Design a protein with these regions (language model features):
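Conserved HGGG/HGGXW glycine-rich cap/lid loop of the alpha/beta-hydrolase fold
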Residues: 7-53
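Conserved alpha/beta-hydrolase catalytic His-Asp/Glu region
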Residues: 135-192
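Conserved serine/cysteine hydrolase catalytic core
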Residues: 170-224, 229-232
Length: 258
């Protein structure tokens, strides 16, 4: 069986970090680095992302099993888990399906609910960039950014997305498997099973300016994660760990050291 790509920093109690859609293990580097002073930080590339294997299936029970396979490979019996966005859903699914592996759970700006499709322009833009790279109409990151700007207005979002571009033997290509992600997108937006629950310590961290977690979601969250609490980072959007890194890391450390 294929194993996800992972990176280990530091020593101590294991802490597993799981990135969001179109990301890679590097995206949580600003969390991994300081946490590695006190923890064995295991950063994961989700399938179809980063340097991990490609598969045309991204349902959450399977994505959770992928991470558990890494822990089994490393002989890690229990860990703290932190996931952002899609990675938060994967971390929640691990807690729901494999609770004995989970010492505690930290979920960054996502709820276990179904979300409406809202990445279509991003997917379309990235696929157009990929097509023009294949046709050798795009040969530089600058050209890729210019084309993507017709689909994605915000420069920082484009910069994040284009971190997926890499060069091998002088040829640009995407590390993430765009077609699989596009095919599996409905699965990624799905809710987790509301009939499952995890009674362990759980922290939800919400960006104050983000609408990914709302007050109404507590009606779904509480029965599934009865021992959960929430922290809000004022002024932070969905990318709360990147926008307010010091505040985010303090909340994480305080929770882990409780």
């Amino acid at each position: 069986m294929s194993l996800l790509n992972f990176q280990i920093r530091g020593e101590g109690q294991p802490l597993v970090l799981i990135h969001g859609l179109f990301g890679s293990l590097d995206n949580l580097g600003m969390v991994a680095k300081p946490m590695a002073e006190d923890y064995q930080v295991i950063s994961i590339d989700v399938c179809n992302h980063g340097s991990s294997f490609h598969r045309n299936d991204m349902n959450y029970p399977t994505l959770a099993q992928d991470v558990i396979s890494v822990l089994d490979h490393l002989n890690v019996k229990q860990a703290d888990f932190l996931g952002h966005s899609m990675g938060g859903k994967i971390a929640m699914q691990i807690a729901l399906s494999f609770s004995h592996y989970v010492k505690s759970l930290i979920v960054a700006d996502i709820a276990p609910i179904a979300y409406p499709a809202h990445h279509q322009e991003i997917i379309n833009g990235l696929q157009q960039v990929e097509l023009q790279i294949v046709n050798q109409q795009i040969t530089s990151r600058k050209q890729a950014d210019e084309l993507l700007s017709h689909y994605v207005e915000t420069p920082s979002v484009r910069q994040f997305l284009l971190r997926n571009l890499t060069t091998t033997d002088g040829q640009l290509h995407f590390k993430c498997h765009l077609q699989n992600i596009a095919n599996c997108y409905p699965q990624i937006m799905q809710a987790l099973d509301p009939n499952q629950s995890f009674s362990g310590d759980t922290l939800f961290i919400k960006g104050g300016a983000s609408n990914y977690i709302t007050a109404e979601h507590s009606e779904v969250i509480k029965p599934m994660f009865p021992n959960s609490r929430a922290k809000i980072i004022a002024g932070a959007g969905h990318w709360l760990h990147a926008e307010k890194t010091v505040a985010f890391n303090k909340i994480v450390k305080d929770f882990l050291n409780r």
